[in-house]
Amino acid sequence: MGLLDILLGRTKPVAPDLDRLFGLPSAAVTLQAAAGFTPTGGGSVCFATVEGAAFDDVRKEVQALLDADAERTGAPVELVRDEYGYSWMVSRRGPEDLPALVGDLHAVNSALEASGFGPQLLCSVVGFEDVGGSESSGASEGSGGSGGSGGSARRLGLVYLYKRGTFYPFSPLPGGDGQRRDSSLELQVRAALADDLRIEQDLNRWFPVWGAPGL
């Protein structure tokens, strides 16, 4: 970063640091204590869809590696494509096995990065829920009213931005057209996890990952 960047207040982009994913298990303990959320056991890695044999080979190797885990229970690792054209590698573990889930996400990111597909990596998402359906304390974005979920489980994703090396919370609200988020809860989670994770400070980068698998 040069002198002109300093004078103009520009900041050097944060390099990807996949090891920050390993901070999620401790953050989950804080999150449960602060807001009542627990892991769902679902998580996923999002990347720009890539066609070609080279990518298919890497994907198959990663899936085979993760599915070979003797301790894995439930659905096998799968590749899905969302309505926006992005691809997601999805892993599902037991809710109590968050460290293993984080290991899966780290392995997927690392394999794609090592094979030259780092530029296609976008984010990783780990799902949480509050089955108690605690009422949110404020209005949600685009809802024009209370962020309460009417007694149903609240959902929350902790999103890791690969190119930023930062995390942010995303909480979609149930009902309606599925395009509302609980902004007040997201801000509450940001404050609660400030000492556990490197939180993305630019709120404009808190992109809504509607329909993210594993969330």
Residue ranges of predicted features:
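Charge-rich, low-complexity segments
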Residues: 1-55, 181-215
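Conserved NTP-handling cores and scaffolds of large molecular machines
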Residues: 11, 66-70, 112
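N-terminal start-of-chain detector that recognizes signal peptides
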Residues: 15-20, 59-62, 95-98
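Terminal interaction module
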Residues: 18, 116-133, 151-215
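A glycine-rich, hydrophobic loop/mini-helix early in the fold
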Residues: 33-90, 94
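Core of folded catalytic or high-affinity ligand/protein-binding domains
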Residues: 72-131, 156-158
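Compositionally biased, intrinsically disordered low-complexity segments enriched
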Residues: 133-152
